[in-house]
Amino acid sequence: MLKNVYYKLEENHQAGLSELLEELETEGICRIVAGDRNKFWQNRETEPRSHGDTVISDALLITDDCRLAEQAGTEGIACLGISDSDGYFAGAAMVLPDLLDVDVQMLRECYCHFHGIPATIAEGGRLILRELAEEDVEALCRIGEEDGMEYAFCGSRRKAGFTPEVLKAYCREQYRLYGYGLWGVFLKEAARSGEVDGKERLIGCCGFAEASEYESGHGLQLELEYMLSRPYWHRGIGNEMCRMALQYAGEYLRVDTVWVQVHEKNAAGYALAHKLGFRPADDRGKCKHDGVGLLSLTNQRTADMIETDS
């Protein structure tokens, strides 16, 4: 768990730093000036590695110092690199040009990706959206084989295939490289009731793929994708998990447009898309995808998609 954030930045890279430090304080995460490169390491001890009263494995470093970042990576410390050049930044789990769009959620995801921990994306009353791990693949494939799943993933995911091999590679690379993707949907009630040894139950997935096949609009365009295990249909869970994903997209991904493709025979899927705020992209609202009739819907304002139900 991320508990401490060190930072060492030149003045020209400190834009947005004060706002980030305030948010860290609100979240109860300790902020520590890293100071001189040598002094940063002088108090290191043997396992558990520590820096003063700080356990190094609970820390993340923000720096524009390439050598410090490389040393941090070698020592097992997650690092967010700040650089306005395209050069290689060894040791950094993530590299950004500045801190202006950085928030605590992004730091937590950077920390999790460095340590190979599935990051929690959002948490609601009943559900948790969390990055998928390889250990989730078997359960997710079983859900994909349930009756009624032939309408799931009309777009790019259906073309890519839904196999254990594809999903395991996806878990290893997608979140680290892109910062978004298809997330696991976990039911919290299963943990409370002791159904699955104190763990939340994986009941589906929900998230985004790049909407590269759409040409209209500018900026980041994503396609909403989801799949829900059949026993959990008609309980409002599909609506809840999609709203959680859309809210995340609006707040953290700075999305310009979100699309959704719904099979023309999937009346329930169309009703859910409409309830979420999606509308037909053209007068007919129909297109063809690999010879299958689909309804293509879009809404260019993510805020409109997360309105409270009337």
Indicate where each model-derived feature is located.
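GNAT-family acyltransferases
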Residues: 5-7, 19-30, 94-231, 244-248, ...
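Conserved active-site alpha-helix within GNAT-family acetyltransferase domains
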Residues: 70, 239, 264-282
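Asp-based, Mg2+/Mn2+-dependent phosphohydrolase catalytic module
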Residues: 1-60, 64-127
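Charged, low-complexity surface patches
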Residues: 10-13, 61, 221, 238, ...
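Generic recognition of short, well-ordered alpha-helical segments
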Residues: 15-19, 74, 219, 237-240, ...
